[in-house]
Every structure is written in structure tokens, then in C-alpha cells.
Amino acid sequence: MEVRGLQPKRQKTFARKHLVIVESPAKAQTIEKYLGTQYVVRASMGHVIDLPKSRLAIDIEHDFQPEYITVRGRAQCLKELRTLSKQSLQVFLASDRDREGEAIAYHLAQSIQAYCDTPIKRIVFNEITPHAIRAAIGHPVPIDTAKVNAQKARRVLDRLVGYHLCPLLWHKVKNGLSAGRVQSVALRLICEREVEVKRFVPEEYWTVEGTFEKDKKSFSALLILIQGKKAVFKSKQEATSAIGLFSQSEARVSQIRSFEKNVRPKQPFTTSTLQQCAANRLGFTSRKTMQVAQQLYEGVSLGTHRVGLITYMRTDSVRVSEAAVKEVRAWIATHFSDALPGTPNRYAAKGKSQDAHEAIRPTYVAHTPERIKAHLTRDQIRLYTLIWERFVASQMTDARVRSLTFEITAGPAVFSATETQVIEQGFYRVLKMLSPKDLSKAVLPPTKEGEVVALHNVQSVQHFTQGPVRYTDASIVKMLEEKGIGRPSTYAPTISVLLDRYYVTRIQKQLMPTPLGKVISDLLTTYFHDVVDVSFTARMESKLDEVEEDKIKWNCVIADFYPAFSEKVSTVMKDLNSMRGVFDEKTDVVCSQCGDTMVKKLGRFGFFLACGKFPECRNTQPVPLAKCPRPACDGNIVGKKTRGRKEFYGCTRFPVCDFVTHFKPTFAVCPQCRCFLVEKSNRRVGTYTACVNPECRYVSPTRKNLSLGKEAVLDGSHRGAQDKGAVQHYE
């Protein structure tokens, strides 16, 4: 019987689409705009499958097989990706094309295939642009299992080293410490450099400079020979005696030498050279450089659309695609046609370069810094400018410079003056932020050999020999790369771990080991020399590269290393005496809660004071650095941090006393007003100490400011722009 008016319920249908899985939401947002409505782009938020943090999870008895689990907090994300995969026509895995990205793609594929039979494809690209994404969709590739195995070997190796060394450090030194295959080598390098710095004894020496004039144009020259001998003097008296030998002599230009040379543009950035340049030019830490580069790579809104501005930023290759070379040459031909070489410039890859990616370059050279700066943050535009200038310059003609040297003879003395001028701009024409700083303007007057020049003034200048300098972010990255330690993706995290663990501190951009870092490094160097040996670590990196090239099996690398290492750990754990409490130091500070004396201890973030009756009394407080200089205030000055983690120094009696300074107090006392001294620095005299009291102009004498005189420090460096707002509410 038919019942009119009743219709069968219509089943809801899901419009099946293509699913693209990337690592980050920002990357997903950019790519989704390129692909249109037939694609859904989702982020895995990094690894969804990894080793558990709570246990070793390596089956040593069965070829070191890792026991993976779903990463804590990622189960819901993985569930959603599986559900979307089942509803999709096909799945594209678009994680990064390095080892970590390949492992992410592999684990996602395994998880999805266990849940549904939706076709899964791997796509790779070097830049996030519409053309690159569509080309990758049209040309999927197999998952690189050799690269996955290299990541697995690295992960297992680091887990074995960490999970054996960390308990040893906890048991013998203190809880919460860590050690790692790469970070411990970097720590050793920093500690060894610190020893070299401490051992170095500066030696005084003097040079002589003369001021000459020709046709009313003055120029300076350095005394290089006196009576046929090198003009370097051990004391001011020797320099003064030498001046007396020629001060009344006639000065003539005895020789003029001129030569020209080509200056080749530098190759495009790799991860290492980008971090070094950003540190030197912009003052960026390695971590900040990579964070900003990640933002530029994943995509930035340019008003009407979102675009990835640079290619993948973790690379050790200087290779550039032919399409990019063609594009930049067309741009140069339009804007600097006379600086376009006849053929493209080619740059040789280093021996250990993986060459999987291109060099770091802008995705569109037409996006000049001036054109897009309104859409970028200050940090983004500064880093982008470095990358853009370096890439464009790399495909321009050589610059040509002329070096002109005068030798001037005055009696038994020979002076030398040199200037370097650019005679053909070449690639210098495009450089603004990266313009060279070592090229001088014309300073030497036109003259001929044999002509007389007037010697107006002679002065002796004090110097001290320069010893080894502490590592900075730039120099430690350069050293790690030169030694073959780590890979582009590990440089910034390695430095960050050392800082976060308080093994190293960064003071005025210099990396200095803490007492804790020195103890850890000494212990590991003494008992685990192979693990923290530079050449051993470099060889291990080479073996991981061979795994990636499918030349050796990943578990063979582990098997060659683990037995001897495990035996060594057991021996040290048994024989090494405990070092717990080695940093503890009794003080005369009284506990404010129980009246017992406080003990100076070393924690994760530096020294602090703890009650001597711990655990009965758990009172802690910062270590006092100085007495508060305020009249009638009995508080102490301690280190504090703002919400933005910037350090400053204030009184313990805040808010009753609101004394604040941003300069680090020393334990020294001003001999004039009895306030404490603080550390300061400027480019002219380096680091020095000065009184915190703005009414007192005391500056402690140092080797550097002795050579310039006290006035050189006070002429605006000590009481200048740097001091404004540095000491607040003093009166």
C-alpha cells in the first residue's frame, strides 16, 4: 500500500576531497589558499609517533628496534587525520624533505594505512609557492626509506647516549642534568676555548703613526721600518726613542704600489652561513634566526594573498634551480644590466653537503625588500633583506677594487699608507645591508715617487696582543660546521639546550661556560672521551649520511657503538665518587623564616640561596650581588627577570625601595662613593666597570681604556645614551 506524502530520507553525502598533511598550521594556511576547494590541508603539529619520554624504549636484544608510541597530546590530532583520510579521495604527505620530515611522513603513512585503504602519496617541494605546490601534487615520489632509517639511527643513538649518561650525572653530580651526543661536544669546545681565554696573558706593544700633508690634504701612515728593522716596540720609551731618529728628517714618497683585483660575490646562504651572517649583522641568536626564517618560509600575508617568501631554510647546499637563476638574471638585466655576467655564476658544493635542497633564496626575486617591507615585521624584513641581497648579488658580476700603497721615507724610518677603492661596483650595486665595511674612500693625495710630503705630527700608540676570543652564536656554528658536527637542523637547538640547561651563559653575545657546565664537560671528557671527541662525532655524522645514502644498515651503526659505550657507563657508575654538593657554599646570610644560615647552591638557572635546614625549611632567595646604594635602605641587589625574560637588577625590599639598574653589579666597591660597580661595555674600549651612582664619574682603569685615557671612556660612553633609563629612581 502506497502512502502518499512520505518520501524516503535522503542520505547525507560527503563531498570527497584530497587531503594534504603538513607539519604546521601556518604552512597549512598558506598551501590551502593555493590548492582551492578540492583540497583540505591539515597540520600534524610535528611528530605524531615517537619514542616515549619515560623509558628507554629500545629493544637492545633485537637489533636495537625502537618501540614507538603516539606522542602524548597528539592522539586526537592523529584520530582526526585518520578520519579525514578515510573520507578523502587520496592523501598527500607534504612534510619537510629532510630526515625528520621523511620520518613524519613515514609514521603518518603507517598509521593511516592501518586504519583505511585510501591511496597515500608523498610530495616534496623546496618553496611554498603556487607553482611549486602544484608541481609537487602532479609528481608524487615514494617515501625515502633510507632517509627514514637515517633518522631512526640518529634517534636511537641519541636516546642510548642520553638515557645512559643522564642517570650517571643525576647520581654523581645533581638531578635534572642532561648530556647528548652533539650538545656535549659543543659544550667541550666552549669550555676548551674558555681555558684558552683564561690562560692568555696580554703583552704590551707600541706602534708609531705619522700624519702627513700633501697639497693641503692630510693622511695617516704607519711606521713599518726603523733602521731596517720591524717597527714594533715593547714600551713607550722605545717608541719615543725611535721617533727621535727621524722627527727632524725630510719625508719623501719613496715608492707607490698599485694593484687591482676582482672580488667575487659570495654564494647564496646555507643554514650555517645564514645564522652566522644574521648574528654578525643583525645580532640575532641562532634560535631567533631560524624562528624568523621559518615564518618567511611558511608564508606571510602580503595584503591580498599569502605567500612563502623564502625557500626551505635547513640546507647545506648552495645549489640553485635553473628556473630561479633564469628569474634573477632577468631581474638583474632590467635593473643593473651592466652587472649581468655573460653566463650564470656557479658555486661548488662542499664535500659533505647533502645537496637535497636548494640554497636559501627568495621565492620571487621581484618581491624586493622595499616592495614588501610594509607587510613584514622588523625582524622579518631585516632577515629577508639579507637573504634577498645575498642571492641577487650571487648572480651579478665581480666587483673590481684597486689597492694603492704609499711608502714614505723619513731618514731611517719607512711609513706605509694604504687605501682601497672600488673602481667597478659589480655586485656591490645591489648591496645595502650587506655592503662591505672594509672599503675606504680616497684618502691619499695625488703624488709621484720622490715628491716631498710634510710630516706634521707623530704619535705613539699603545696596544695589547689579542688572545683567543670566546665563541659567539656565529663562531660556534661555524666551528660545528667546519668540524662536521651536527647538521643544519641541529645547530640552533644545540646552542639553545646548552643555554636552557645552564651549562652555558650568553654575556654580551659571548658564550661562556658556567661552573656546572665546566664540571659536566670535564667529567665527560675524562671518562667518555670518545663520546665527546670532535672527530668521533664527525665520523658518526658521516655514518648517518651513509645510512641515508643506503650504503650501510642503520642498526650496524648502533651495534658498532653501543657495547663499548654501555660497558664504560657501568664502570664509571661503579668507580666514580659522588660529586653531589660540590657547588654548595655556606654564607652569612640569615634565613628570614627560621633564622638558620643560608647555603649557596647551584640550580638549573644559576646560583641561589637555600636554607641550611632543608627540607625542614624550604625558604630560598636569589644570591645578593651587592648592597642597595639607596641611603637608609638595608636591602640587597639581586637579579630579576621581566615577563619577557629580560634580566635586570633590583632591590629585595621592592616595592618599598624601587631601585633598578640594567647593568650587572660586580662585587667591587667604588673607591670614591662606596656604591657598587657595574659592568659596562662599548665599541671603543670594550668591557669596563663603572660606578652605579649617576652622580659619581668613577671608571675603573683597564688595559683597554688605559690606552685611550680615562676621558675616552667618559666622553659619552660611560655617561651617554646607553645610561639613559639604566638607573631609575636613584635619589
Curated annotation (Swiss-Prot):
Q: Region (Interaction with DNA): which ranges? A: 178-183
Looking up Pfam families in the UniProt record yields: Topoisom_bac (PF01131), Toprim (PF01751), Zn_ribbon_Top1 (PF01396)
The signal sequence is none
Disulphide connectivity of cysteines: none
One GO MF term, please? zinc ion binding
**Matching CDD domains, A to Z?**
TOP1Ac, TOPRIM_TopoIA_TopoI
Q: Which top EC class is named for this enzyme in its record?
A: isomerase
Catalysis: reaction(s): ATP-independent breakage of single-stranded DNA, followed by passage and rejoining
Q: Which InterPro entries match?
A: Topo_IA, Topo_IA_2, Topo_IA_AS, Topo_IA_cen, Topo_IA_cen_sub1, Topo_IA_cen_sub2, Topo_IA_cen_sub3, Topo_IA_core_domain
Q: According to its UniProt record, which cofactors does this protein need?
A: Mg(2+)
The Gene Ontology biological process annotation of the record reads:
DNA topological change
- This protein is called DNA topoisomerase 1
